[in-house]
Amino acid sequence: MYMRDTIAAISTPPGNGGIGIIRISGGSASCIAETLFRPVRSGGLISHRFYYGTLIDIQTGAVVDEVMAVIMRAPHSYTREDVLELHCHGGMLVVERILSLVLRAGARLAEPGEFTRRAFLNGRIDLVQAESVMDIISAQTDAALALAQRQRGGVLSSRIAEARQLLLHALALIEAYIDFPEDDLGETDVESIRSSVEGARTHIRRLLEDFNEGRLLREGISVLIIGKPNAGKSSLLNRLLNENRAIVTHLPGTTRDIIEETINLGGLAVRLLDTAGIRHTEDVIEQEGINRALEKIPQADLILFVLDGSRPFGPEDRLILDALQGNRFVAAISKADLPRVLELPSECCNLPQVSFSAESGEGVDDLKSTVRSLFVSSQAIDNREYVAISRVRHRDALSSADGSLSRFRQGLDSGASLDLLALDLREALASVGEVTGQVTNEDVLDLIFSSFCIGK
């Protein structure tokens, strides 16, 4: 990957559409515009202004398409390089033909995420903000989008910068005494160092505490719906989806394969998996569906154990309950519109329990609230100022920083040498810097930006 190259890519999704966009970034962007674009009005292209005209194949002189062109000159662009965008009709044939002409005019095809990578390397955004671009694109709920937008706006980066400044202050005091060994570390400076480090550690630990919520908002959760035949699993799925996605009959064993659908559960993306009814059967195909359902149990974030409230707790329910031990699950008691017959065994007393009727909708909202509350707080969903780390990379780096600060505190209390204390602080600073990209390496950047789409 060469930063001096001019890169180009299609920035709109594949397939036919109303508009297609080809994005070009680099030193040759203006030259490519002059070569291929013929504006209706003569004169040079002013930065950040759209121009209507035609796109020409310079080898044949033929008009390829009518386009709108905009040049955004460095450093006032997404990449802080000259950026040219060509907006054409959205047919794939014309979009790909224009891209081929741009490549022939001197650009090369961009790699996945290369535009955003250049924005990072050129100092326009930090690494957290770069990652948030992909999170904005892939967000499935308003809460996930709001979190990504706050990260993109620099709120998380500011929190991390505050911790970093406190650590730099402490390190500066220690290094001053290292440079002038004839002076002893005074009590006032010791307390100032301790206060700065503890302040930084508080910032870091608060972010670590919110990691699971941040990750779940970004990634969502998987919820497995499991139960014996005719317990009401597929009816519950249909009610949650507000559509007849699964076939529902009075015949047991109707659902044989796993049905997957995603819903927005009050700000939390939930992947629902409806499964075959669990029972002993001689039907080979049905048994395969049962085996697949049982295999999904340890992979799910939560299991909704659907029990028929109008029938006694039976051997099939016991079989499922035994299979669920050690996993997180909710007892979802169906058919609340019928007289209650079910009595749960004693080991279910401390479980979350919700009665519902898929027929009338009674209790379904309570079930949704129960599921959501097990994973995220109302603050994470509703507070527009909420910010959290949301990636394992963030957590690992901050956990490493917290470990370094723990060693620092122990060393400070036990009278360790200033050199060792400074080493712990430098390690903590390096770990904190990994989050925003102040300290990084090419392998990490390759891993992050390879997940982006081409053209972003």
UniProtKB/Swiss-Prot annotation:
Annotated localization: Cytoplasm
GO CC entries: cytosol
Domain TrmE-type G positions: 220-376
Binding site for (6S)-5-formyl-5,6,7,8-tetrahydrofolate: 23, 85, 124, 456
Highest taxon of source: Bacteria
The protein's required cofactors: K(+)
Cofactor note: Binds 1 potassium ion per subunit.
Any one biological process term the GO annotation gives: tRNA methylation
Keyword set, alphabetical order: Cytoplasm, GTP-binding, Hydrolase, Magnesium, Metal-binding, Nucleotide-binding, Potassium, tRNA processing
Keyword Nucleotide-binding recorded: yes
InterPro entries linked to this entry: G_TrmE, GTP-bd, GTP-bd_TrmE_N, GTPase_MnmE, MnmE_dom2, MnmE_helical, P-loop_NTPase, Small_GTP-bd
Binding site for K(+): 230, 249, 251, 254
Gene Ontology MF: a single term: GTPase activity
Record-linked Gene3D superfamilies: P-loop containing nucleotide triphosphate hydrolases, Probable tRNA modification gtpase trme, domain 1, tRNA modification GTPase MnmE domain 2
Keyword match Transport: no
HAMAP family named in the record: GTPase_MnmE
Free-text function comment from the UniProt entry: Exhibits a very high intrinsic GTPase hydrolysis rate. Involved in the addition of a carboxymethylaminomethyl (cmnm) group at the wobble position (U34) of certain tRNAs, forming tRNA-cmnm(5)s(2)U34.
Similarity comment: family membership: Belongs to the TRAFAC class TrmE-Era-EngA-EngB-Septin-like GTPase superfamily. TrmE GTPase family.
Protein name per UniProt: tRNA modification GTPase MnmE
Encoding gene per record: mnmE
